[in-house]
Amino acid sequence: MNMMIKAYKRKLDVANGRIDLSHGAGGRAMGQLIEGIFHKAFDNDWLRAGNDQSAFSVPGGRMVMTTDGYVVSPLFFPGGNIGTLAVHGTINDIAMAGAVPLYLSASFIIEEGFPLVDLERIADSMGAASREAGVPIITGDTKVVERGKADGVFISTAGIGMAPDGLDLRSDAARPGDAVIISGSIGDHGVAVMSKRENLEFDTDIVSDSAALHGLVADMVAAGGAHIRLMRDPTRGGIAATLNEIASQSRVGFRIDEEAIPMKPEVAAACEFLGLDPLNVANEGKLVAVVAPEGADAVLAAIHAHPLGAEAALIGHVVADDNYFVQMVTSFGGGRIVDWLSGEQLPRIC
């Protein structure tokens, strides 16, 4: 029996090997792949048990669940890769409910011919991101498709967390007079991915803002949870899509100030060069919070005190508007309607 186990666990040739169809066929090669890359990267008691599912205990409160898929191109970009993005994005979706993320799952669809060294790099960084966040990946799946039927690797995730009783953040809860706060500069992720995709170089390196926001959210809830109406992470479609979604769901309008919106000069310059509206550009480490006016100062102070919130700003207010428009006062003193993005400005950004 020991000889069989030893033979079964032969090491992968990660440096030179590539994915082939046998790695998804359920046999020895698949076992070697799971042991040699995924279990090594995500190592924890649940995965070591070798079951097709994981059992876990949860604390009191309301359970929150999310699921997401990641198809970003390129797979590696300044500030992260598809693996770190999958961990951070799933954690953030849970955190936007004011919940504490507890567990993740991850499923990989891998194209035949994909280099094992790249898969190991993705898995290792994904494991490191989950450990840094304190949210383990406790179950998963691997499938392999024929060459040309995918683009390297796609990742699907799910996450589970717990929201404390009494905290009910909903996208239909914005009310006229509420403050609109963003936790930092906009557009970093979308521009970082786009510049890598198009092989563009700028005088200053632009890196993705991909980060797990649950620690920041916990500080915000502690400082003024009773006053927070809702939180959203402005990913695809940027803050323009996020504000329009909230306006439609809450049946209100927004009035925001362009000069108050934080944005790095190099990101602004890159957007101008690429012909992008930064309001439509994706973010992966920022949040938008709508807060009752009496709690805005306390929540903003809590964000500023966190390492991920140094550039946070109050950028506008909720207004009564039967048309549910998002209006912006421009830097020139004029006004414009910030509409939904038409078409696809940045495909496969996450």
From Swiss-Prot:
Catalytic activity: C-terminal S-carboxamide-L-cysteinyl-[HypE protein] + ATP = C-terminal S-cyanate-L-cysteinyl-[HypE protein] + ADP + phosphate + H(+)
Taxonomic superkingdom: Bacteria
PTM comment text: Modified by HypF, which adds a carboxamido group to the thiolate of the C-terminal cysteine, yielding a protein-S-carboxamide. The carboxamido group is then dehydrated by HypE itself to yield a protein-thiocyanate.
Keywords: Lyase
Modified residues (S-carbamoylcysteine): 350
Enzyme class: lyase
GO biological process: protein maturation
Pathway annotation from the record: Protein modification; [NiFe] hydrogenase maturation
Disruption phenotype: Insertion mutant lacks any hydrogenase activity in symbiosis with peas, but is still able to synthesize the polypeptide for the hydrogenase large subunit.
GO molecular function, one term: lyase activity
Assigned EC number: 4.2.1.-
InterPro entries documented for this protein: HypE (IPR011854), PurM-like_C_dom (IPR010918), PurM-like_C_sf (IPR036676), PurM-like_N (IPR016188), PurM-like_N_sf (IPR036921)
Residues where S-cyanocysteine is found: 350
Keyword Lipid metabolism recorded: no
Keyword Nucleotide-binding tagged: no
Task of the protein: Involved in the maturation of [NiFe] hydrogenases. Along with HypF, it catalyzes the synthesis of the CN ligands of the active site iron of [NiFe]-hydrogenases. HypE catalyzes the ATP-dependent dehydration of the carboxamido group attached to its C-terminal cysteine to a cyano group.
Family designation: Belongs to the HypE family.
The name this protein goes by in its record: Carbamoyl dehydratase HypE
Gene (name only): hypE
